[in-house]
Regions:
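Mobile genetic element proteins and their domesticated derivatives, centered on retroelements
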Residues: 4-5, 31, 58-60, 69, ...
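Primary recognition of RNase H-like, Mg2+-dependent phosphodiesterase/nuclease domains
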Residues: 65, 70, 77-79, 106-117, ...
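C-terminal reverse transcriptase regions that engage the nucleic-acid substrate
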Residues: 1-48
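A short, polar/acidic, helix/strand-boundary loop motif
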Residues: 71-95, 99, 103, 120-137
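Short acidic, Gly/Ser-rich segments with clustered Asp/Glu that frequently serve as metal-coordination loops
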Residues: 61-67, 123
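RNase H catalytic domain
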Residues: 102-166
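Flexible, low-complexity interdomain linkers flanking nucleic-acid-processing modules
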Residues: 11, 27, 152, 169-203
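Two-metal-ion RNase H-like nuclease active-site motif
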Residues: 50-63
Length: 203
């Protein structure tokens, strides 16, 4: 909404026309997608903020290898395709956060959730829901849309990487190490549908 509001700055009459930028059009597509499926009903959110530690929700990414996400006893991981050779690790860290909501967001419905990530710049992007980086904005839109669909309010907080050992082992594709550290988790990972795999998302 911020970009839409910014467009009205300096406009003196309601009949004046405004040129919509490509970014603004992409923002409008998010709202159109949500409103097309919204049934007009919503539930009051619980006042409690559910942290990553309370939900057992952790994600991580390794720039050279892959990504991992954990939610309760559920988990998933994957290897980066060659096309995801980004220098900005924040983009790689953002993907498993958004992925976790697409996979398990229905279980987090109607809650206020505090995401933990070990990337401080990503914390800033998530909390402001804005960035000058077009690739990060791509994931901001994905995050906003899925949270609208599940009536989730979210914010992020920095967590030191050393406290994120389980997701870190998955992002390094060390599955056996993960299973030794987390015996209580499901034996098999959650399958990531093709349309949610990184090669299907090109920010």
């Amino acid at each position: 909404m911020g970009r839409l509001i910014d467009l009205t700055v300096g406009i003196q009459s309601p009949h004046h026309l405004i040129r919509l930028s490509k970014d603004v059009k992409e923002d409008l597509k998010v709202w159109l997608s949500f409103l097309s499926n919204f049934n007009g009903r919503s539930f009051f959110l619980e006042e409690t903020w559910y942290s990553s530690s309370k939900l057992d929700l952790y994600t991580d990414a390794s720039g050279a290898l892959g990504f991992g996400a954990i939610f309760g006893s559920r988990w998933c991981y994957g290897k980066w395709p060659a096309t995801w050779s980004y220098s900005n690790i924040a983009i790689l860290e953002f993907y498993p956060i958004v992925l976790s909501l697409y996979l398990w967001g229905h279980v987090m419905r109607n809650r206020c959730i505090l995401f933990f990530t070990d990337n401080e710049s990503l914390v800033h992007v998530i909390n402001k829901q804005s960035s000058k980086d077009k690739s990060l904005i791509f994931f901001v839109r994905k995050l906003v849309l899925i949270c609208l669909e599940y009536n989730i309010v979210f914010k992020a907080k920095h967590i030191a990487g050393v406290k994120n050992r389980l997701a870190d082992s998955l992002s390094r594709l060390q599955v056996q190490s993960f299973k030794q550290l987390a015996a209580a988790h499901m034996e098999l990972p959650t399958e990531i549908p093709l349309h949610l795999q990184p090669q299907s998302w090109q920010p």
